[in-house]
Amino acid sequence: MRNTVSTFQELKDRGEKITMLTAYDYSMAKLIDSSGINGILVGDSLGMVCLGYENTLSVTMEDMIHHTKAVVRGTSNALVVGDMPFMSYQTSIYDAVYNAGRFIKEAGAHAVKLEGGATVAEEIKAIVKAQIPVMGHIGLTPQSVNMFGGFKVQGKNEKVAKKLIEDAKILEEAGAFSIVLECIPEKLSKIISESISIPTIGIGAGKYCDGQILVYQDMLSMFSDFKPKFVKSFGNIGESIKDGVSQYIKEVKESKFPEEKHAFKIDDDVINKLY
């Protein structure tokens, strides 16, 4: 049975943790979905891990719709959330509702995610009014990387911490069904999670959130050159892939692959007529 926004709320209400991961294509979505995950975020992080951009700012709506379609086709259980990219909702409330609608109508997503606190409250209200579920996102919001001066922990001083608490309450009031808390101190995320009735989903926000999300390439160690402090390795897929590719190259070079069992047969009398 498909997880829904109601499932997320039910899990919080009974004290059961919510599990989420990112996915960007059909194959990985199918694997993650079959593992029993509650939700999949088609994150604009695809700009960095799939498209090779330095940050998420270059990702377009067309990129997001394309990848979200693929993920939806690979799932039957997880709630699929489409990440609204930079400048798809900041320009006007009309654009916010229109682009959120594209995720639902064209891509088949079940909800959308917006970054920001009080500044996007009106956009969230309008999207929810259009019957589209919205996941909020506060703390380190990657689309604001230039304002933050880099990817830095947020909420370490009293002023910013109080603003994050207030932002969470505003997002709940605006109609968000859950909120991602990214890169904020663990004790602050505990206060926020206890201050609102909707679920919090942490990424680098400690154990007190109602759920957790990670980028699957990070938690499966697909890239060895970058590993955020908050990521635990749950597998070493990157090394396995490199080992497999290296072995493939070796066997092709040495004519060990393909073997007879990998080849298709033809009768010798047919072959003889071809010479």
Swiss-Prot record:
Annotated localization: Cytoplasm
Disulphides: none
Sorted UniProt keywords: Cytoplasm, Magnesium, Metal-binding, Pantothenate biosynthesis, Transferase
Primary localisation category: cytoplasm
Pathway named in the protein's UniProt entry: Cofactor biosynthesis; (R)-pantothenate biosynthesis; (R)-pantoate from 3-methyl-2-oxobutanoate: step 1/2
GO molecular function terms attached to this record: 3-methyl-2-oxobutanoate hydroxymethyltransferase activity; magnesium ion binding
Active site, per annotation: 182 (proton acceptor)
Residues holding 3-methyl-2-oxobutanoate: 44-45, 83, 113
Entry GO CC: cytoplasm
The record's free-text note on cofactor binding: Binds 1 Mg(2+) ion per subunit.
Listed transmembrane segments: none
Co-factor requirement: Mg(2+)
Positions contributing to Mg(2+) binding: 44, 83, 115
EC number: 2.1.2.11
The UniProt record lists the keyword Cytoplasm: yes
Keyword Lipoprotein appears in the UniProt entry: no
Signal peptide: none
Top enzyme category: transferase
Function: Catalyzes the reversible reaction in which hydroxymethyl group from 5,10-methylenetetrahydrofolate is transferred onto alpha-ketoisovalerate to form ketopantoate.
Subunit structure: Homodecamer; pentamer of dimers.
UniProt family annotation: Belongs to the PanB family.
Protein name as catalogued: 3-methyl-2-oxobutanoate hydroxymethyltransferase
